[in-house]
Swiss-Prot record:
GO biological-process terms attached to the record: phagocytosis; regulation of immune system process; signal transduction
Organism, scientific name: Homo sapiens (Human)
Reported modifications of this chain: N-glycosylated.
Domain Ig-like V-type, residue spans: 36-139
Protein name, entry field: Cell adhesion molecule CEACAM4
Motif ITAM location, chain numbering: 222-236
């Protein structure tokens, strides 16, 4: 029988090194590239304000930035670009003169309009000429009365309308009252006064009087003396006959 094989120096087995290497590979993770994002500041802006599309988590090795209007850079019009080596903005076909690209890749919109709302994509190129892109949203709403909420504006409009309606109703009432009063006065002026009878005042001031007695047939105050005694006729009251 041959002599037993000698153990490796140091007491280590070859397979033990393989186990250590496998353990290190299990717990080691290669570094990953953080995807940059786009954030609108403010998230919803009023028409006529300025908005910044902020580029977050941008790598320091970026050599160029290109902003496109659309959900992707491919096939979307170029707004503007920025070259870090020359530190200059390069306008594109969709440039309106209100956009500015900063050295960190952020895009500033000045005096935005409702037509500016939509998706915007930033495409970056690093020193190795690798390209990456991210998309953000720009929200624009109509500008209301400064300092007043929508409910307050609606209340003011309602109050003004109610006030106008009350004033119109008051004017109509005054016109109708004046017209009615003038009509009554005109009717009174046009109505002829009642005819008055001679010797009497107007009908509304006349008083009812008893009918005058019909005149009796005048009879002579003398009659044939039926009695020869004259003293009897001397006793006749002639004044009573005249009055009656």
């Amino acid at each position: 029988m041959g002599p037993p094989s000698a153990a490796p120096r140091g007491g280590h087995r070859p397979w033990q090194g393989l186990l250590i290497t496998a353990s290190l590979l299990t717990f080691w993770h290669p570094p990953t590239t953080v995807q940059f994002t786009i954030e609108a500041l403010p998230s919803s802006a009023a028409e006529g304000k300025d908005v910044l599309l902020l580029a977050c988590n941008i790598s320091e090795t970026i050599q160029a930035y290109y902003w496109h209007k659309g959900k992707t850079a491919e096939g979307s019009p170029l707004i503007a670009g920025y070259i870090t080596d020359i530190q200059a903005n390069i306008p594109g076909a969709a440039y309106s003169g209100r956009e500015t690209v900063y050295p960190n890749g952020s895009l500033l919109f000045q005096n935005i309009t409702l037509e500016d709302a939509g998706s915007y994509t930033l495409r970056t190129i690093n020193a190795s000429y690798d390209s990456d892109q991210a998309t953000g949203q720009l929200h624009v709403h109509q500008n209301n009365v400064p300092g007043l909420p929508v409910g307050a504006v609606a209340g003011i409009v309602t109050g003004v309308l109610v006030g106008v309606a009350l004033v119109a109703a008051l004017v109509c009432f005054l016109l109708l009252s004046r017209t009615g009063r003038a009509s009554i006065q005109r009717d009174l002026r046009e109505q002829p006064p009642p005819a008055s009878t001679p010797g009497h005042g107007p009908s509304h001031r006349s008083t009812f009087s008893a009918p005058l007695p019909s005149p009796r047939t005048a009879t002579p105050i003398y009659e044939e003396l039926l009695y020869s005694d004259a003293n009897i006729y001397c006793q006749i009251d002639h004044k009573a006959d005249v009055v009656s």
